[in-house]
Amino acid sequence: MLMVNRRKISIIGAGHTGGTLAFILAQKELGDIVLIERQQSEGMAKGKALDILESGPIWGFDTSVHGSVNIEDIKDSDIVVMTAGIPRKSGMTREELVQTNEQIVRETALQIATYAPHSIIIVLTNPVDVMTYTAFKASGFPKERIIGQSGILDAARYRTFIAQELNVSVKDVNGFVLGGHGDTMLPLINNTHINGIPVKHLISEEKIDQIVERTRKGGAEIVALLGQGSAYYAPATAIYETIDAIFNDRKRLLPSIAYLEGEYGCSDICFGVPTIIGYQGIEKIIEVDMNNDEYQQLQHSAQAVSEVKNSLKFK
């Protein structure tokens, strides 16, 4: 009898982001899905899994979606996505999240190493740069199999704001965002184009500065508007794009949080940089040319991430 080896994606955290990601992945039929929640939130995981399954006949997908509170159910996953953690509240800085979420991520990474030792881990828990570093250290996985995701999201916000300003299709806006996920992120203005035309030729420097600042505050803007909770549609879609690049070995050039060993003058830090994403995970880190001002801003961002990282104790 022919046995089909189906791909498996486990999502730890069945909240807004985890549930939305599961729904997107189910529609795309990228693999079987397991939604994991805490014991006291069993109904959330199972309820969302069932709700997604029941949309299958309408959307036309046959994806298996399973909700569980048993971490053992991630066994043999190809990809494990970590969205679990306390949510960011209005007025809360990313750094204030770090102590509680570090413990959650550390414990989860150890469990992943036990039950899915050959998986690729994608981290979304905030503050995501430091949580990616935590997952890297705790899991013992090789660096190419630990991916933090914020750059796709930040670049999407940046591109959206530019498209709105120019009243053009966002499909024609190409831009990259490097650095930490927060107030020190660095949109590469000199590398931003609208269908090949440099953005500086179309938007004033003052307006570009406003767009950059809005991009940096993009997460906080959503938090303030919602009043409770944080963004989840765009973050979930960013994770989907990463998973699609891995499973289909697309060799996509995508901004990701990667462990650096000298790239961009940074070492022993997880940080947002351009990466090639394929079947092995982060297959290459791309170093782009930048002027002195951009380089100094990037170093400032790295220092901010390092300060949060250094407040924790890693063995």
Swiss-Prot record:
Listed EC numbers: 1.1.1.37
EC class: oxidoreductase
Biological processes annotated in GO: lactate metabolic process; tricarboxylic acid cycle
One Gene Ontology term of the molecular function aspect: L-malate dehydrogenase (NAD+) activity
Binding-site residues, substrate: 88, 94, 126, 157
Pfam family, one: Ldh_1_N
Residue positions of the active site: 181 (proton acceptor)
The keyword Zinc belongs to this UniProt entry's keyword annotation: no
Catalytic reaction equation(s): (S)-malate + NAD(+) = oxaloacetate + NADH + H(+)
Keyword NAD in annotation: yes
Keywords: NAD, Oxidoreductase, Tricarboxylic acid cycle
Coiled coil regions in record: none
Binding site residues for NAD(+): 13-18, 101, 124-126
InterPro entries tied to this protein: L-lactate/malate_DH (IPR001557), Lactate/malate_DH_C (IPR022383), Lactate/malate_DH_N (IPR001236), Lactate_DH/Glyco_Ohase_4_C (IPR015955), Malate_DH_type3 (IPR011275), NAD(P)-bd_dom_sf (IPR036291)
Function field: Catalyzes the reversible oxidation of malate to oxaloacetate.
Record family assignment: Belongs to the LDH/MDH superfamily. MDH type 3 family.
Name of the protein in question: Malate dehydrogenase
Source organism of the structure: Staphylococcus epidermidis (strain ATCC 12228 / FDA PCI 1200)
